[in-house]
Amino acid sequence: MNKNFQKFLSVLVFVVLTKYSIFALNPTVSFNKGKECQNQEDWYGAIENYTTALQGNPSYGEAYFKLAECFYAIDEYELAITNLYSASKLIKNRPDIINLRGFCYIGLGKLSEANEIFLSVLKDFPNDVDARFGLAELNILNGRISGAEKEYKQALSRQNTNKKALLSLALVSDELGNFVAANNYINQALKYHSGNPEVYYFAAYLAVKQGNLEQGESRIRTAIHLQSDLDKAYKLLADILYKSNRFEECIEICKYRITLDRELSSAWFLRGLASKSLNRYEDAISYWQTGLSIDPNDEIMRSALELLALEYTDIEDPRREEWALFHIEKAKDYEKKFYSVQARYEYQRALRINPLNQEARIAYAELLLSDGFKESYLSQLQFISDQGEATQKILDTIEGYNSLLSNTLSVKWNINPFYLDKKRWNLGLYASEGKTELIHMDGTKIALDFIGDLFVSSNTINANVDSKNVYNFTAAFADARKKGYDYFCILDFTESEREVSGKISMYSGRNGNLVSSWDVYRTGNDRFVSALRYFVTKIESSLPTYGEILNRKNSEILVDIGKKDGLENEDTTEWIVVKKGAIKTADVGIGITFLESDILGYYSVEEIGEEMSSGTISIKGFYDKINVGDYIIPVDTVTPVEESLENKENTEKEVSADSKVREPVLLELLRNIKN
């Protein structure tokens, strides 16, 4: 159970129990204790004390308001609104109470209602800056950053030393690319609030974002000097040290954070990442395992652990059994909900980590069978048998299916489909010159490596990952062209506490033309992996399918594409046979081109298996030049020369269904600024 959720439940139980207690403490004492907890961001302790104060004095309006602030801080917006309603009955016409209701409506996705509240406050209180802050948030949510800048400037014009206005303008100006203005606002904030650690924290953040690590380190150390228990400052310092390749110092800061609070999974993550950079792989694995025991749902940490385990540990390593078990349990949960696609992925992931896990392989085989892939089902059971782990039931099943499938194409042509190399496309994967990462350092690189690992199971794509460097377009294109990639992709990835978003842009490896791009946004559980799987699916489906002739008997040929490649019974697709080595990618868009003179004949599909198909050929012209190794290509994937002059760039956006309001990372930063 989530740690914060446990705390929340305990507080609710406390509220219910103390409601009828006759031993309530002095309301003022409890209220003051609540304020102390709130100032230290101990929201649950504050809620407990404010609730106690209200037991002693049910008409304590300020306690209701403070209670609402705490519920707002832990995203319990409905409870916050309930307490604001109680506060407003006891405290009349106070704008901060009204404004907080507006912010709660933003959290609930009721943007129009929030807008009305902030405008009503400004009508009665034209100089109220919090209402301006609310309107600024609404502008950011609607993608109007310049509109937010205007509201923050209005607030600053009314209070020219307001800390939140100055810091907000610095962040917004930086987002707009106006770095001179951003630094000017930060310098003003440092001038007027020189003793405030939060100001130095954001000053350090902007310095790092603009590439000035030395200045960022100086400022964040000042923040720590001003407030020695400011954990987010220690985290940023550790991030700076990591980015500066000072891994030993980074580890020391992480160790210090852990001594203060062993439940800080972010400290375990970065400690593991720095250890990996020092080639201390066992240490990294140990730290990440500890971090995942604290937060099992940290997908990026789990991905980093699995990627390192695949690279560093032996297949027989007993720890792989434990790492695979996580995915097996998730798969079982999905099966209970009849989510077969998700269950299949989790079993595949378990087998990627531990190929020897019989439970996962049998379950995966059963899913293949339910989808009608009997040959694939049999191959999975034969794998178990080859490892010497087959039970008598499995051996009997293998015998039965060998008899049942005795007339398949693989038997007729004596070719084992398990060993077919159907990789058609060479794809380069690069990380963009990304944004400053606040939660997981190297999150983009880990995402890129994970995408590459997902492509391992692809039938048609050979993915080549370069996650050690960051690239702009020019550098990525030069590298892709040098290595002869058909296409190359550049990943841009961003995460916040609750969301991930990303974009993959795909370009021609021959000429650098943008051929397609995909945007994704996810929130909720499994958002990281879900977003990356979306990218992989889109890239796979965008690339044309074509086959290779495996064998020939007179006019009959065997081709290495089948049901798993999208062929269906009674296939009516027009196929052409093209000379081996004669095809190339289209000049513009995604497609295949070749010379008319390289067309050797035509192909008609007659029998379709899971991995292969067979049919008859007819030759073009007088001479039969069709040989094993030549290509068969669907006519609809061919890009005529005249179409290659048209721009076929495609852009798609995917938003998760459980999303109410998309909240940019910028907004998360702005909300963290205290008034």
Task: Give the ranges of each region predicted by the language model.
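TPR-adjacent "capping" and linker segments in tetratricopeptide-repeat scaffold/adaptor proteins
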Residues: I22-V29, E311-F326, N416-D421
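Helix-start (N-cap) detector for alpha-helical repeat units in TPR-like alpha-solenoids
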Residues: N26-T28, G61-E62, R94-D96, V129-D130, ...
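Canonical tetratricopeptide repeat
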Residues: N32, K66, L100, G134, ...
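Structural signature of tandem alpha-helical TPR/SEL1-like repeats
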Residues: N39-T52, A73-S86, G107-S120, L141-Q154, ...
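Structural marker of alpha-solenoid helical repeat scaffolds
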Residues: G56, L90-I91, D124-F125, R158, ...
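Surface-exposed, polar/charged interaction patches used for macromolecular assembly or partner binding
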Residues: S218-R221, K255, L270, N279, ...
